[in-house]
Each structure stands twice: as C-alpha cells, then as structure tokens.
Amino acid sequence: MSKGKIIVAMSGGVDSAVTAGLLMEEGYEVIGVNLRTWEYEAPVCDTTKKSCCSPEDIRDARDVGLSLKIPFYVVKMEKVFQEKVIDRFIDDYQHGKTPNPCVECNTFVKFGALFEKAKALGIDKIATGHYARIVRNGERYAISNGVDIGKNQAYYLYGLSQENLKNVTFPLGGMTKPEVREIARRMGLSVADKAESQEICFIPENDYRKFLEKKHVEFTPGFFKLRDGRIIGKHKGRENFTIGQRKGLGIAWRNPLYVIAIEDDGSVILGEENETYAESFSVIDVNYQGFAPLGEGESFECRVQVRYRHTPIRCRITKMNEDLVVNPLEEVRGVTPGQSAVFYPLNSDYLLLGGIIRKGSIRMQVAKEESAIAFRS
C-alpha cells in the first residue's frame, strides 16, 4: 500500500539519489525534482569546473530518475535564487559582511520555494539528502545533527519554519556517508562513487572576488587601520576581506595581523591575535525552532556555533528589542558579520534557534570609541 506522494529534491549527487531510492523501498510514490537555480553563462561561470547544481549534475539526477523509474522534473528557480541568494550575497560584501549563501538557499529555495511548488501540485511532503534529523521538543519541531559527525548539516538548516519541519523527512540522518555509498552500489546507481562538491554553486572557481568583478561590483577602497586609529596602509577594496583573515593583507608588522572589523567608510581594522576574540555580539533575523520566541529582556544559557565546523561554546543570550545579544562564556574568535549563529541546549544537539550575526561586538564598539578619540585629538 502506497504511503502517498513525496517530492525528493535531487541534486545529482549520491545523497539525494539514495534518499529517493530508500523512500521508494518504504512505499512512497517518489517524484524527483531538480532545482535549476543558476544560468551557467560565460564568462561568469566556468562550467568545466566541478560544482553542485551544474548541467552535469542535472544530467546525473535525470539518469538516477530513469534508473529508479520515477517521474523526474527540472524546476526553474532562477528568479527566487537571484533575489534571495545572489543579490543578498553581493549586497553583503558591498556592506562589509561575509554572506552565507547556502543558508539562504536552504531557507528560501530548497525548502521555501520547493514547498510552494509541492503544495501547488497537492503534495505535502518533501525529502532531501541532508544528514540531519527532526526531533520534537514539546509542541515544537527542531533540526538535530545526523549521526555522521563529519557531515553534520544542522547549521545550514536553522531557517526552516515549523511548517517546513512538520512536512520534511531526512532519510540519511541516521547513516554515515560510507553507508550511503554502499546503499547506492546495492541499488546500482551511477552516482555511487561521485565526488562531493565543496564549492558555492554559482562560484565554481571558488573565487568570490572574481565573481564580484564579473558582476561589475565596484570595490570600496580604503585604509588599513589599527584599533587606536593609526593608518598603516591602503587596500583596494573592503570586499576583499573577512573577519579573522590573516593571509593576503600585504602588511609587514612585528606580529601577525588579522582583520578584526570592516567599517562603513571602507576602513579595514587590523589587530593581533589576542584582539580577535569577541566579548559579545548581536544576532538579527532570528528563527526559532526547538524553543518558543523569547520575550523582551528574557535570558538563558545555551551553546552557540558561529560558523560551520565550529565547535559550539557556552554562552548567555538575551532578547533586546528585535535582536539577541550573545555573551560568550568561553573564548570565541572570528565572529563574522553576515555569517550565521545557531544555538543548541547545553546538553543536547537539536537547534533552539538561529540568526545572522550583526556587525560589531561590545569589544569592537569600545575600539571605535577609542579610535574616534584618537582622531579628534
């Protein structure tokens, strides 16, 4: 007996292929969908480079659909991808931030827009090949990391709504990558040993600076400064830098220097290693998953992860106006505006909430005040 229809987002990789195969074995009527998000036109992209969502990946996804004997469709998502991912990517760099396009893509395209397409077809359920699980915390749903510690992808999924979480399934959450490849071989899938892409899909050369140049973005030149306001050099564009960066500065100094702030006027503030640690920072555009929205002034302890592959640390968060103020209780460096911060309970691995790191921390704000005094004197 059929369990009903389900849409599987098929990228052309082994993970989504096995997801489709497993759901078929469970009795679902699987419909494969590939999301065409990006027009691969020269000279912006070199299609000979390996990246996800490429024409090669679409062909691989279609081949898997034929092998599994399931309906397969390519759905055009270029417009929403341009608005929600690429335009934001460019805007963030133009404002001194370091964007996280994979988070935006998951939130607005792979789940947001795909769910809308599914509902238009009268289908409630979708599935993807993410290594994640869904748990319940009381009346709320939340993402939890998968069992494969090398593939934990909860960080990229904090933007999913409660409605999304009720209707999505992740069949690979309880598996490891080697196990998934072995299942693909058993199923006779052509992508069983296909290499993974590590690049942003619309930047196959993994060079965002070249991408910005080809999109005719005007870089904002300025000065390299120390925290006390001293000018120690010039640069050709703040878009070339990110918080925590050490290489490629071209500044000779007695000790290694790191980017610790990027200013609105184009100034790039440099400091030594001990100046890279955040005292506090704020988070905006918060989405709550396993935790009910905080009231004004409410506060509690949890753990925060400030980038992918970062080990979560203890912190205290407080709701202030529309923002969350985060006070780390352990040392953390490289807190980067534009990147995502996600929060977990102290003793569990499911997501409480997440949001975008806003520019500045208390430590950096103090530095700005000191710099202003230095310039006035």
Swiss-Prot record:
The active site is at C105, C201. It is found in: Cytoplasm. It catalyses: S-sulfanyl-L-cysteinyl-[protein] + uridine(34) in tRNA + AH2 + ATP = 2-thiouridine(34) in tRNA + L-cysteinyl-[protein] + A + AMP + diphosphate + H(+). Its main location: cytoplasm. GO terms for molecular function: ATP binding; tRNA binding; tRNA-uridine 2-sulfurtransferase activity. Belongs to the MnmA/TRMU family. Gene3D superfamilies: Adenine nucleotide alpha hydrolases-like domains, HUPs, Translation factors. It comes from Leptospira borgpetersenii serovar Hardjo-bovis (strain JB197). Residues 151-153, 307-308 are annotated as: Interaction with tRNA. Disulfide bonds join C105-C201. The lineage of its organism: Bacteria, Pseudomonadati, Spirochaetota, Spirochaetia, Leptospirales. InterPro entries: MnmA-like, MnmA-like_C, MnmA-like_central, MnmA-like_central_sf, Rossmann-like_a/b/a_fold. GO terms for cellular component: cytoplasm. Transmembrane segments: none annotated. Pfam families: tRNA_Me_trans (PF03054), tRNA_Me_trans_C (PF20258), tRNA_Me_trans_M (PF20259). This is tRNA-specific 2-thiouridylase MnmA. SUPFAM superfamilies: Adenine nucleotide alpha hydrolases-like (SSF52402). Catalyzes the 2-thiolation of uridine at the wobble position (U34) of tRNA, leading to the formation of s(2)U34. The record marks H130, Q339 as: Interaction with tRNA. GO terms for biological process: tRNA wobble position uridine thiolation. Keywords: ATP-binding, Cytoplasm, Disulfide bond, Nucleotide-binding, RNA-binding, Transferase, tRNA processing, tRNA-binding. Its EC number is 2.8.1.13. ATP binds at A9, M10, S11, G12, G13, V14, D15, S16, L35, G129.
